């Protein structure tokens, strides 16, 4: 893998100005599930960015095995004082804020090994270039081929690769 990646990257690094590198990750170690978080709205006023962060942290307070980590926290919707289906609660008034999320987890070692491989391959060609982030393969594919409207209306993305086929279903964003 290192050799193939190094050959591909060295060609592009020498021909193009590359500002960032995103690494896609997949495999049977990837898991996803729904989680909810809850927080009181500070001072019983308007929902702030800090309130959103508190709700997300509450949803992330889950028990994972030592070899797993959270890769993505994807917000689905929010509820304020029983009013549900809210996509953007920022600035709305209320007392209690609930958030529904889809969490994606993966093996720490798989992520670390991918990052090491990419760093080794790009390190010789450009000392200032570092991986920006590791992204679930299906999410990376969706960012390049789907519009926000398609994800909102609902779509099934099927990515047929050389060795695997990945499926991602988007509904309500």
Where are these regions (language model features)?
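Nucleotide/phosphate-binding catalytic cleft detector across ATP-hydrolyzing
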Residues: 1-157
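Glycine-rich phosphate-binding loop of actin/hexokinase-like ATP-binding domains
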Residues: 153-173
């Amino acid at each position: 893998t290192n050799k193939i990646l190094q050959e591909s990257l060295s060609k592009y690094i020498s021909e193009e100005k590359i500002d960032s590198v995103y690494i896609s990750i997949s495999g049977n170690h990837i898991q996803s599930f729904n989680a909810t978080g809850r927080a009181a709205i500070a001072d019983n006023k308007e929902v702030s960015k800090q309130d959103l962060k508190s709700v997300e942290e509450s949803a992330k307070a889950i028990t994972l095995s030592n070899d797993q980590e959270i890769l993505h926290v994807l917000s689905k919707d929010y509820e304020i004082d029983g009013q549900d289906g809210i996509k953007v609660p920022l600035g709305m008034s209320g007392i209690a804020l609930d958030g529904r999320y889809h969490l994606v987890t993966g093996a720490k070692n798989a992520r670390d090994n991918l990052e090491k491989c990419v760093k080794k391959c790009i390190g010789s060609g450009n000392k200032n270039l570092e991986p920006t982030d590791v992204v679930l393969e299906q999410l990376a594919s969706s960012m390049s081929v789907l519009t926000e409207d398609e994800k909102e209306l609902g779509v099934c993305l099927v990515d047929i690769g050389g060795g695997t086929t990945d499926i991602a279903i988007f509904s309500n964003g």
